[in-house]
């Protein structure tokens, strides 16, 4: 099982755009997302890495991606962002079986849901998703598939208040379970890559039994 020690950064307020520089200043290391769990059917592995830190009340995450084509068709939050060039952060903040999936495409459109597994997930209301500040090097305007090698970056500030089935005021000292993924279901070459390995016979990111550890 992979494990990351998530460093705490003492900062009163930070925008998503400021996150890359803040993580660099605090020497936060990047972690590769490189597990091709279904190599026979989906062998393609884009380059992806992420750095993560936390503050008193939020996660700060920065993704760096290089892939052979890009797509950002989803128009609004909670649309089918996983069909686009998508980076995903799954996290179980309370150890009660519930986990949140925060899926964001390369244009900063995201999906936020909660549940115990793939089925019967509850999506966040718009007033919740808008609390997640996003910044991307590709801008915020949706676009159709571009079949050209592209490098892009995405930063998210995820306040604990978006974990809407919980009342979390602090995660200091906690050990959480979660995973990070890169996918693109409707790209010319679909792919399903993970930070922590997954042992299911077919692509499935909703597998908390294969989550890694995040130590805060």
Question: What are the functions of these language-model segments?
Answer:
Residues 1-216:
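Structural preference for beta-rich elements and adjacent junctions enriched in aromatics
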């Amino acid at each position: 099982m992979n494990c990351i020690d998530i460093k705490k950064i003492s900062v009163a307020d930070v925008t998503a755009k400021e996150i890359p520089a803040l993580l660099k200043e605090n020497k936060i290391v990047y972690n590769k997302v490189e597990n091709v769990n279904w190599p026979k059917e989906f062998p393609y592995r884009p380059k992806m890495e992420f750095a993560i830190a936390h503050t008193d009340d939020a996660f700060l995450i920065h993704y760096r991606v290089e892939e052979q084509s890009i797509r950002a068709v989803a128009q609004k939050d909670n649309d089918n962002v996983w069909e686009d060039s998508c980076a995903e952060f799954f996290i179980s903040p309370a150890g009660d079986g519930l986990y949140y999936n925060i899926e964001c495409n390369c244009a900063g459109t995201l999906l936020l849901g909660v549940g115990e597994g793939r089925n019967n997930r509850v999506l966040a209301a718009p007033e919740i998703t808008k609390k997640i500040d996003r910044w991307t090097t590709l801008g915020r305007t949706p676009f159709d598939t571009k079949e050209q090698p592209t490098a892009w970056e995405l930063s998210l500030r995820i306040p604990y208040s978006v974990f809407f089935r919980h009342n979390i005021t602090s995660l200091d000292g906690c050990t959480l379970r979660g995973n990070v993924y890169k996918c693109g279901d409707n790209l010319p070459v679909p792919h399903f890559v993970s930070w922590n390995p997954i042992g299911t016979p077919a692509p499935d990111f909703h597998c908390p039994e294969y989550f890694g550890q995040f130590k805060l």
